[in-house]
Amino acid sequence: MIQKKSKCSDYIRRVFYTLLGQKRFRKLLAFSLKSRYKSSSVCFPVNIEQVKEILIILPEERLEVLHQLKNVISLVKHFKHATVTIVCERSASSYIKMIPGLNVIEYEFQENVAIPVLLVKEVKKLNHIDICFLLHNNPSLPLRYLAGVSEADTRVGYDGAGGFPFLNLQIRPDTTKRYFADWNCSIAKLFGALPDEIHWSVAQKTIDEVNHLLKELNIEKKSYLVGLDIVFLLNHFGNSWTETLVNNIAQLELGQLYFYVSENPSVSCVEWIQKQKVPFIGDLSASRTAALVSRSNLIISGNTPIYALAGLLKKHAIGFFKEDEIEMYCPQTSTLMGISYKTATEEIIAQTMSLIANHNKKRKT
């Protein structure tokens, strides 16, 4: 794993980046990369059988990584004869490591760093890269630069993700696909990879660790677990609305409620949570969060990693989505249910309770 390092050279690069500004620095990086490539053209379609080395660059955010998993797995299956290396931010690397047979280069995200020097060194250690996939719709400058400096014959990304010399093949996603994970798979489809259902599971060791954590909270192993992404609810709907929802759910006596506390809750959120008579589980690693979702029977959240994990692990979940989000991020399946909202209203609580009641009725039949 690549660790953060405080060096004089890093400081100088940050100062230089700040003085020039992102737009000028991008032009400077593009100019420095153009000398590596004789032509901006690319040979397509690619001869799949001749591909030996693939580099996949993933987004920095956990949620974006989860939305790319279907794409990644489709590509890995399609290029099963090739060596696949994934570049992934450390906090999300556990998700990728659950896919067997991959080389993973981890790094820690740093703001205001235009040239990922340590990442470049790691990529340079690889054999000649045939294809570099930049799987990000709006990649940061460091990730664009990494794709450019990979010197891959084919450097592919989404339309608008970066022109030559960073990328030499840009894909316009299939506009008939509304669900984001399927929309992302436009790249896999272009190369002949057929997106498949994700069969994803959490290591038993990690599940055992979470079971031990639940035991410490006096939650029985066989409890029917209902997890509320409490920080999301408080931030989007406020204390009063959230408290009403929690009380209504508690009255149903579904099973054991718990609060999932995501990263960096505000002081006011922490104070509110501590006043409630509900056990809470704080900021878990990516793998333990997946294990917690795996152990849960119902998740209530929104457009968040925990909701995306519920979808991947085929767990029941109810999500709150803004009107411009629900079609893209909630597929509305037998397990994933979504509610569209503008503001916190009693009607949304009523809709939520109706979905929970239907879910409870089905599980008892």
Each language-model region and where it sits:
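Nucleotide-sugar donor-binding patch of glycosyltransferase catalytic domains
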Residues: 2, 6, 10, 157-158, ...
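Positively charged, low-complexity intrinsically disordered leader regions
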Residues: 2-49
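Extended, non-globular alpha-helical segments
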Residues: 24-28, 32-36, 42-45, 264-273, ...
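Active-site donor-nucleotide binding/catalytic segment of nucleotide-sugar enzymes
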Residues: 52-64, 201-268, 323
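Active-site and donor-binding regions of nucleotide-sugar-utilizing enzymes
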Residues: 52-175, 288
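Alpha-helix capping/helix-boundary segments
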Residues: 91-93, 139, 265-266, 305-306, ...
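Donor-binding and catalytic core of enzymes assembling or modifying cell-surface/extracellular glycoconjugates
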Residues: 116-122, 127, 240-318, 322
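Mid-sequence helix-capping/hinge segment at a functional interface
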Residues: 160-235
